Amino acid sequence: MSAYNYPNFRTENGYLTETIRQKYLTNAIADKRVPANAHRIAALVSLTASNDTSQPIQFWQLYSVLGPERIVALIENFYTRVYRDETWFSSVFSRLGDLQQHVGTQSSMWIDVMGGGQAYHGGEYRLSFHHTHNAIALMNDRGAQRWVKLMLETLNDPSIDLTDDARVRPSINTFLGHFMSKYAAEFKFNDKAAFGVGNGSVKRKINFMTMSSEAIEALSEAELIEALTARGVDVSRYGTKVALVNKALML
């Protein structure tokens, strides 16, 4: 029996959720980190984290686990560090507003992307405007490195409550890595961010019983071997793809 019964918090698409999810999955498909049909896998695009701990939590599912208070506490911890940092870094933020203003804005963005509903008004346009205008002085190697350093200190702070689900931190790492790579490409700085271990690959679940002959034949040899092995078949007895396909068709 699963130790979890998500959602812990009611979820809803935000202004950014669908757009960011679509872009992330498109990149992940290209990198073969998720199946080619990832956009159509209900459990993958759902806003609710899986109770199956063998499945990663996608970052748009984090709100269903964390809720608003944990997210706000994390962001407040981070910006407290920002405002205590060296002037060259902290002044870019302080000239735009006080600590609580930044906590509110950043928390809203995280909540919006992570499945907490329409919290970040203005969506992608607002996000782009902020980085191309308000934060442009830090959209470079030096600024990115300091931002990452402070965020890592925040995430590693034992006072931060990420729940007892070990999948949460890799999901946050994946979320941060996705945006850092996006900004590195857009503003042409080196993407050397290392937030820690991210989500593992999501493998396609293959059920031969629900597949047509054509669909089984279209599977790769590696997919056939993995799926047959999972069903207890000794694949060493089937040395070619044709033999593997024939065995799958018999099940």
Indicate where each model-derived feature is located.
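Core of compact, soluble alpha-helical bundle domains
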Residues: 2-251
